[in-house]
Curated annotation (Swiss-Prot):
Induction: By herbivory, wounding or elicitor treatments in young leaves of cv. B73, but not of cv. Delprim. Induced transiently by F.graminearum and combination of jasmonic acid (JA) and ethephon (EP), an ethylene precursor. Mg(2+) 1 binds at D333, D337. It is found in: Cytoplasm; Plastid, Chloroplast. Keywords: Chloroplast, Cytoplasm, Hydrolase, Lyase, Magnesium, Manganese, Metal-binding, Plant defense, Plastid, Transit peptide. Signal peptide: none annotated. Monomer. GO terms for biological process: defense response to fungus; diterpenoid biosynthetic process; ent-kaurene biosynthetic process; farnesol biosynthetic process; geraniol biosynthetic process; gibberellin biosynthetic process; response to ethylene; response to jasmonic acid. The Asp-Asp-Xaa-Xaa-Asp/Glu (DDXXD/E) motif is important for the catalytic activity, presumably through binding to Mg(2+). This is Acyclic sesquiterpene synthase. Its EC number is 4.2.3.49, 4.2.3.26, 4.2.3.47, 4.2.3.19.
Amino acid sequence: MAMPVKLTPASLSLKAVCCRFSSGGHALRFGSSLPCWRRTPTQRSTSSSTTRPAAEVSSGKSKQHDQEASEATIRQQLQLVDVLENMGISRHFAAEIKCILDRTYRSWLQRHEEIMLDTMTCAMAFRILRLNGYNVSSDELYHVVEASGLHNSLGGYLNDTRTLLELHKASTVSISEDESILDSIGSRSRTLLREQLESGGALRKPSLFKEVEHALDGPFYTTLDRLHHRWNIENFNIIEQHMLETPYLSNQHTSRDILALSIRDFSSSQFTYQQELQHLESWVKECRLDQLQFARQKLAYFYLSAAGTMFSPELSDARTLWAKNGVLTTIVDDFFDVAGSKEELENLVMLVEMWDEHHKVEFYSEQVEIIFSSIYDSVNQLGEKASLVQDRSITKHLVEIWLDLLKSMMTEVEWRLSKYVPTEKEYMINASLTFGLGPIVLPALYFVGPKISESIVKDPEYDELFKLMSTCGRLLNDVQTFEREYNEGKLNSVSLLVLHGGSMSISDAKRKLQKPIDTCRRDLLSLVLREESVVPRPCKELFWKMCKVCYFFYSTTDGFSSQVERAKEVDAVINEPLKLQGSHTLVSDV
């Protein structure tokens, strides 16, 4: 197994290529001190940038330089950025990518004909700029489609598969219900692409067929980043073929460098992930959590969700606590649902309320002792580490997060015992907490870089991010787990809609819930990308990452409850060596 990745001669060569593109096509000596290269040691990747109004985009080169004939077109520059992001190595080229995107954004604001007269370039620019925090409107995409005479139909693109593919990808980054143009483009492009898959007419190239098939598997928010990276690395022959058809990306050394760095980065990450997972497995045994026979053992799934989204090596602490608290919340959930008596549950809540004074209260059972001791030790260790990182005491906040979860679960138990049927509003207020994302996501915010003051934690934006993420996740879960929970005598949003909706059927209730699910997802992404923000962008991104995790497990089935549904994805991210397709057959040779 490879050791942690370092910049190699190949990746340095690739940096030179990126720098050439970011400078407008003029070759630059690697390491030259141009304005677009300057950044502080703490400056983050463009994936963590905030939404930028026009005035805040870096000036880069002079206007005269920007207007010079450029060897690389905007489309070619964006294609390079897209390749680096899809291969999971964009963070190594943050400054170069920022230059490219700043230049592209200026061209977007100026309605440059290279963007506005080319549908494929416009769609790609819209998608990449938006997801990197630039303030772009879908109205521009509407005008481009309308100007092409295809306002009511995308049929004119029937034989232009790549344009259809870019339109389809652009349609998935909606941040508002008002962006109906994206829904329309998405529906039509998806239909035409599926027709092409079925007929094979316009997809004569097997690589293009596979690329379309992969894109239609689901929107970008339904998979984990590291799984997406793996697919692109293993199917690099598809990307390489497209690069070879593109001037200034067709250099075989460039494609080889991209592949080499991507493989080293992914493989070294697996080495790290395996070590972290082994540590977590030991922790489960040390805490005696494996002795709780009633509890679902979901460590692998929680670690997959952490490594699959927070994949950078420096986020080890965040991954570890994410997985630990995921395991603990699942055990607590099972304890409240099926295993604990009312006396045991009340005892556990009281112990957490007492916290450091818990010795004044006896453990009602060994099960309570194991669960409380695991929470207590983990929270105190985490609090000590977080307090050092944040330069202030954090433990009290971590205890409050757990107490909020336990009290909301106790409310659910009391409803069940008294046979009380809550209103839909009552249910959602409580159920967004009982879904259990608080102890997983909120502590991780302290370990992704920025300082999180107490005023940030108390700000309404912080609460809104949590509410949108938790509501989206809870509704996705309810739709997929309705049958099982109904058989167990439990209420959820589906059954409440049926109960309060008169003659509404179960299938109608599930369809009706799709709108609030979509709304929460769009509103969350909008808030994450918003520039005017109290919560730092790297922290906001964790809420979005967990939203993607919820889609990953619950968008089509109850993938979390199954022991095997996502087992192959666990291996794909953590254990399984890369298997390259096409001409790149031996990873070790790259």
